[in-house]
């Protein structure tokens, strides 16, 4: 006769469906904690940036915001969305992603020069140009947090930077050390993967930049859209 409460800001589709048919009771919080306001969100299409000769991972708007926060001595978090990254191939010019014609799942690039569907086994050679727009600017996504850190140091040499990922947090002590250092204003910018996204409260963070925000929509997973929503919201 015990009651169980499933707590989540982003419940799975199965759980939400069960509330709609009466199997579960849906309890909702009417207000955000501490009367917090929703942040202002800017979505930038990097394809448009490319047309204006900006080949950086950072949009011009994000660069302006970072400069502004550094000038004001406020803190910044940069999150690289790499959850489930499996080497899919996309066109930087038009955004087209190579997908399996049978499963509609993104194809994974392999060192032998082929694209493979890990659901049905379909294979095809990696194209030399985009089949949709004809651009030769087509490749597997290959940017990690270390590369982002290098780019930030180059663009913003005045900023103090911490990086938080699997390489820098191999022990519990290092994980807590990075969070403590950022909380104590020993750094201006924290760069990381999904481990920096939820469960932290840094009152002086006034800017969060999500790099490649739509990246995980193209992973070889039929739950890609659901998982992306859970991660970003």
PLM segments and residue spans:
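Inter-lobe coupling/hinge segments of SF2-like helicase ATPases
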Residues: 1-233
